[in-house]
């Protein structure tokens, strides 16, 4: 199976995640990188966005999870990002 990679790097958001109360009250800056692994031959050949991944939608998924939800662990943030992308797109795997 052919696998290509799309990487969105250095997405910066302000969120309220952490185990300590101060982290949740004050918030902090989070920088997120996401790798999407899949076969991109069809969108590459057809030049059709509907056959591929809309980067704006992926960015919005990450933004929503980081900015609008609260988690104790950064691992939970990453897991939720990965699961949401896997549910939304036909990708082989996601690295956050």
Regions found by a protein language model. Name each.
Residues 1-96:
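N-terminal, polar/charged subdomain of small-to-medium soluble alpha/beta proteins
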């Amino acid at each position: 199976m052919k696998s290509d990679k799309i990487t969105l790097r250095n997405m910066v958001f302000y969120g309220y995640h952490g185990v300590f109360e101060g982290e949740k009250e004050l918030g902090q800056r989070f920088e997120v990188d996401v790798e999407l692994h899949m076969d991109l031959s069809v969108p590459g050949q057809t030049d059709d966005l509907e056959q591929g991944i809309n980067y704006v939608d992926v960015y919005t998924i990450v933004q929503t999870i980081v900015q609008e939800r609260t988690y104790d662990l950064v691992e939970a943030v990453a897991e939720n990002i990965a699961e949401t992308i896997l549910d939304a797109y036909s990708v082989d795997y996601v690295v956050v």
